[in-house]
Amino acid sequence: MIRQIELGDLKGLNGAYRYDQKDAAPDFFEVHEHAVKMGLDDVVIRRLQKLGVTKSPSGIKADVGINKAYLSLKMSGVGKSSLINHQTRSGFIKIFGSNSDAFQLLDAEVLKYIKCRRDRLITEDVGLDKREEFNIFISDSFRHAFRSIFDYFVFEGTVGWGASKFPAECILSFGKALDPSTWSVYQRNEYYDHCWPSLVFSLRRHGRPKFRVADRAWFLGADDGAPKGQLSLRI
């Protein structure tokens, strides 16, 4: 079930953020309206800084707390959010174990993806149309097993930091960050099914990853000789 949520006031709280319904909220949006008229986006940024609202550390899954509930913020429409950000094969093994159904089914699908890439049947990003056409990342068994991986990275934690001190209880999806009419809340038990048709899988290279032996099975050659071997998931 999707619910619209009401306007409130942003305040920092121990590395996560709280959004209480208070009279100060109109002040925040008054600043935003002024910034739009003047073309001064940094006015909004300065106001947020004064309120103690900053980017959460990477080990924290909840971006904001609203009415004592911790939420993760996800953008819809243009600038869609990343759900799994450049993760290696060994990272999935570390969290889920090499013998788990979740990892083994994911591993098999990534290998199918790599074969399709090498055969030039698909390009880097694989959305629903290509998933269905080439039967990758789409089977019922994969959909069932992948839920635990999805839920971990979206709500619970990361590979590097482990379980988050502030796990997300639900998702606040927004089209325009400062337009509450575009905000919707998804509970944990409904967000995966909501995202399923929109999931885009890709194998990329980001930064200078420290690959391990276990990562080699996912290596996909590139023109510069450096392999692509990190799985990304976005909507």
Identify the meaning behind each predicted range:
Residues 1-62, 66, 70-235:
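Short, positively charged
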